[in-house]
From Swiss-Prot:
Top EC class of this enzyme: oxidoreductase
Effect of residue 195 to W: 5- to 16-fold decrease in catalytic efficiency with aldehydes two to four carbons in length. Exhibits 59% of wild-type acetaldehyde channeling efficiency
Enzyme Commission number(s): 1.2.1.10, 1.2.1.87
CDD domains registered for this protein in UniProt: ALDH_C
Gene this chain is encoded by: bphJ
Regulation of its function: Bound pyruvate or other intermediates in the aldol addition reaction catalyzed by BphI allosterically activates BphJ reductive deacylation activity.
Protein family per UniProt: Belongs to the acetaldehyde dehydrogenase family.
Pathway assigned in UniProt: Xenobiotic degradation; polychlorinated biphenyl degradation
Keyword Transferase included in the entry's annotation: no
Consequence when changing residue 171 to A/F: Exhibits preferences for aldehydes similar as wild-type. Exhibits about 80% of wild-type acetaldehyde channeling efficiency. Displays significant reduction in the level of allosteric activation of the aldol cleavage reaction by BphI
Keyword Oxidoreductase: yes
Name of the protein: Acetaldehyde dehydrogenase 4
GO molecular function annotation: acetaldehyde dehydrogenase (acetylating) activity; NAD binding
Length: 304
């Protein structure tokens, strides 16, 4: 039996519940706590049925147990508004925070683009951008590694059913954080992000459109090759990530059309927006866990 790093999840909504399913399959992570604020929530009930410890007292219900239970990694799937407070309390106990809200107080992480850059930095909070960011930033990066991107615009369309109350509260933060990461991680000089919640029934699969405006005539062969290589990288942890059309070249503009199907761990397969976020968070946490297990990373308490 290999040793696993113990984890806690804050936020038993759509994202937290889907993430829990993924962590249970991880070879190096062991989820032991699920934290919520509503004792009647479906997510807390499910976690309890799986034998996970739960509290409905928010992060303050977890803090007294973290050291005794050996929790070293905490995932926050709540809301940007409460994340800073949650992170401060968790970091003070020497646990690493993986932020699945658009709070973005820590550095951005999009695994296929910059996961390796986070190795050995001793960071105690990393931000997973947003579901739209995880789906589209690899495509912007695939273009910008070939030639400069003056402007990158992404449009993420998700089913209304897959967007819970936390996501809805954070729509403005979603667009700001995603646009910022299109620039910082994707490499575009200027970024823009648009999210659409589609109420259609039956719910539609997650769809993403990426437009890149280049500074010079596109090298079509190189860009096409780079995009296909990046798609394969993302598919390693989100098998349902696929190129529907493109790259389409029109003057200086390159457009890519994507679809993301989920594994159906919690919501049905149309909710690929959950998968791309939770799989990226799990992959990021696994990298930190592997470092901890190898003795290359010792987490230190951070006092605000």
């Amino acid at each position: 039996m290999t040793k696993k790093i113990k984890c806690a999840l804050i936020g038993p909504g759509n994202i937290g519940t889907d993430l829990l399913a993924k962590l249970q399959r991880s070879p190096v992570l062991e989820p032991i706590w699920m934290v919520g604020i509503d004792p009647e929530s479906d997510g807390l009930k499910r976690a309890r049925e799986m034998g996970i410890k739960t509290t409905a007292d928010g992060v303050d219900g977890l803090i007294p147990h973290m050291q005794a239970d050996g929790v070293q990694i905490v995932f926050d799937a709540t809301s940007a508004y409460v994340h800073a407070d949650n992170s401060r309390k968790v970091n003070a106990l020497g646990a690493l925070m993986i932020d699945l809200t658009p709070a973005a107080i820590g550095p951005f992480c999009v695994p296929t683009v910059n996961l390796k850059e986070h190795v050995g930095k001793g960071e105690m909070n990393v931000n997973m951008v947003t579901c739209g960011g995880q789906a589209t930033i690899p495509m912007v990066a695939a273009v910008s590694r070939v030639q400069p991107v003056a402007y990158g615009e992404i449009v993420a369309t998700v089913s209304s059913k897959s967007a819970g109350p936390g996501t809805r509260k954070n729509i403005d933060e979603f667009t700001r954080t995603t646009a910022g990461a299109v620039e910082k991680v994707g490499g575009a000089k200027k970024g823009k992000a648009i999210i659409i919640l589609n109420p259609a029934e039956p719910p539609l699969i997650m769809r993403d459109t990426v437009h890149c405006l280049l500074e010079s005539e596109p090298d079509q062969a190189k860009i096409t090759e780079s995009i296909h290589a990046m798609i394969k990288e993302v598919q390693k942890y989100v098998p349902g990530y696929k190129l529907v059309n493109g790259p389409v070249f029109d003057g200086l503009r390159v457009s890519v059309y994507l679809e993301v199907e989920g594994l159906g761990d919690y919501l049905p397969k149309y909710a690929g927006n959950l998968d791309i976020m939770t799989a990226a968070a799990a992959r990021t946490a696994e990298m930190f866990a592997e470092e901890i297990l190898a003795g290359q990373l010792t987490l230190q308490p951070v006092h605000a």
